[in-house]
From Swiss-Prot:
GO terms for biological process: endoplasmic reticulum to Golgi vesicle-mediated transport; intestinal epithelial cell development. It comes from Homo sapiens (Human). It is found in: Golgi apparatus membrane. It is a multi-pass membrane protein. Residues 106-115, 168-184, 234-236 are lumenal. The chain crosses the membrane at residues 85-105, 116-136, 147-167, 185-205, 213-233. This is Protein YIPF6. Pfam families: Yip1. The modification N-acetylalanine is found at A2. The modification Phosphoserine is found at S7. The keyword Phosphoprotein applies.
Length: 236
């Protein structure tokens, strides 16, 4: 170890001492913690979730997903301001609703292509293309909602119109006439308004206050087109 230089004032009596000898007098305060744990709660939670889902059976996975879809259906049927659809988004519910609606709008006759009736692929494309267009419009207006969250909300809010389509199919089993049309018109208008209220309840707060009208207007057109296809549907 290097030695310190002798004192110039008293060269005869100075004795060499270690250069870092004074460091031994430094003490650490008892109030300062010198040990602890480094934990990352979020990663550990994600790791536990992954391990739990990997170890569960296929039946439990399907039932868990169906319960989640059912809860989101209830949020649409009883619309209120909530972040459930935005926080726990999925596309299973919108896919089920879109396929169901497209199947019910499919005409029974083999000549439905010639009489102008909507085909399965046409309905499927209209629904998803419309949802994507509204989502891009929302992002361009400065909305703080992600792409898939918007698709999830718009898809789940088709539920009232799907119910309207089911009711209209049942009404069409009776003899056609003015009363038949008025009943279908009333059902479609009510379910159309229901879809608008449900979607705006989830999406309104995600838009800037001065641009909410610009964001809601395409949603109105989107559900109006679907409602028009339902109202003008005839089985033959």
């Amino acid at each position: 170890m290097a030695e310190a230089e002798e004192s110039p004032g008293d060269p005869g009596t100075a004795s060499p001492r270690p250069l870092f000898a004074g460091l031994s007098d430094i003490s650490i305060s008892q109030d300062i913690p010198v040990e602890g744990e480094i934990t990352i709660p979020m990663r550990s939670r994600i790791r536990e979730f992954d391990s739990s889902t990997l170890n569960e059976s296929v039946r439990n996975t399907i039932m868990r997903d169906l319960k989640a879809v059912g809860k989101k259906f209830m949020h649409v049927l009883y619309p209120r301001k909530s972040n459930t659809l935005l926080r726990d988004w999925d596309l299973w519910g919108p896919l089920i609703l879109c396929v169901t609606l497209a199947l019910m709008l499919q005409r029974d006759s083999a000549d439905s292509e010639k009489d102008g009736g909507p085909q399965f692929a046409e309905v499927f494309v209209i629904v998803w293309f419309g949802a994507v267009t509204i989502t891009l419009n929302s992002k361009l207006l400065g909305g703080n909602i992600s792409f898939f969250q918007s698709l999830c909300v718009l898809g789940y809010c088709i539920l009232p119109l799907t119910v309207a389509m089911l009711i209209c199919r049942l009404v069409l089993l009776a003899d056609p006439g003015p009363v038949n049309f008025m009943v279908r018109l009333f059902v479609v208008i009510v379910m159309f308004a229901w879809s608008i209220v449900a979607s705006t309840a989830f999406l309104a707060d995600s838009q800037p206050p001065n641009r909410r009208a610009l964001a809601v207007y395409p949603v109105f057109l989107f559900y109006f087109v679907i409602s028009w296809m339902i109202l003008t549907f005839t089985p033959q």
